[in-house]
A protein has these predicted regions:
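Post-transcriptional modification and biogenesis factors for structured RNAs
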Residues: 1-316
Length: 316
């Protein structure tokens, strides 16, 4: 347990201010008479719970539903619920103190990945340990990062196309064997077909494999349309540099692609010339005062939330 800060002690001794309690105390105090969930003999046993947190309480910066959970359990749950399609990259050439804040924001908005460009050692202070719940990757240069990211996108497109091909092949085989008679002309996706995904001579206005087993024609259309939409989103993926420079596009009018990589620079110098060169788009936040730029961590938060406002459902 960390020792209280002397300033916090003095503030409490003064009687002002009164803060609400954050987190929970030891399990024995908050769940009187209830068996511990880390006891294998307990009917409430759950391997996600951390014994030390149950003993000492949990004051971490996590949502209440994750109280007492291990770090790995929280990370796995975030993965299971699905991370958002934007990724965040930060240039770490100046050991900027804002990087930790950016990583914390990426966690809050459920970014798919966080990329640190430059030295492996980065200023974690502002992250408040949230990097533990993220997929963080290191890259020696911005060029290597962008090349790696584009290859990953190409791989995701190929995987989706293979999935569509497998669906088409499955249905084709069922039709030939007599199990799917009439199936090929029962469903037509007149808009947004995945035409390039099918083996030669095989139409893609066919249902999905899981639907074929149930005879659900609506499921055929829905599943194939979802693959088609995913491929379109991946093909529209872009690398977006966030910096206020001549020729940049105002964020207020910019439509963020669903799949994208956001590049952020350091406080002061901003993004490197190579990052700006490799970006598909350069976007800036409109400002109306005398200051040349806003804090790098704040700019990153505004940018990520702009994506959230366009693509994510509100959360309570």
């Amino acid at each position: 347990m960390h020792q209280p800060n002397p300033i916090d002690i003095a503030a409490k001794a003064s009687g002002e201010p009164v803060f609400r309690e954050v987190g929970v105390g030891p399990w024995a105090e908050t769940h009187l008479g209830e068996p511990r969930p880390d006891d294998p003999q307990s009917p409430n046993y759950d391997c996600r719970f951390d014994s030390s947190l149950l003993d000492e309480g949990d004051r971490r910066n996590v949502l209440d539903r994750y109280r007492y959970w291990t770090v790995s359990a929280i990370k796995d749950d975030l993965d299971a619920h699905g991370r958002h399609d934007f990724e965040v990259a930060v240039e770490n050439w100046t050991h900027d103190f804002n990087i930790g804040s950016m990583v914390r924001t990426a966690n809050a908005f459920q970014a798919k990945r966080v990329h640190i460009v430059g030295p492996h050692k980065w200023n974690r202070k502002g992250a408040l340990m949230t990097e533990l719940y993220q997929h963080v990757e290191n890259h020696p240069s911005i060029t290597e990062l962008v090349e790696c990211w584009k290859l990953r996108i190409a791989g995701e497109i190929a995987a989706a196309q293979s999935q569509a091909s497998a669906i088409a092949l499955h249905v084709h085989e069922n039709a030939e064997s007599g199990h799917g008679a009439g199936m090929n002309d029962a469903v037509s996706l007149n808009e947004g077909r995945v035409t390039e995904c099918a083996p030669s001579g095989m139409l893609m206005d066919v249902p999905a494999a899981s639907g074929a087993e149930n005879g659900n024609k609506l499921a055929y259309m829905t599943e194939l349309a979802a693959i088609d939409q995913r491929i379109a989103e991946l093909k529209a993926a872009r690398v977006i540099a966030l910096d206020i420079i001549p020729g940049a596009v105002p964020m207020e009018t910019y439509c963020f692609p669903k799949r994208c990589l956001m590049l952020f620079g350091a406080e002061g110098p901003g993004l490197s010339e190579k990052a700006l060169e490799l970006a598909d788009d350069v976007v800036y936040i409109s400002q109306f005062g005398s200051v040349r730029s806003i804090n790098a961590g704040a700019a990153a938060a505004v940018s990520m939330h702009a994506w959230i406002a366009q693509h994510a459902a509100p959360q309570s």
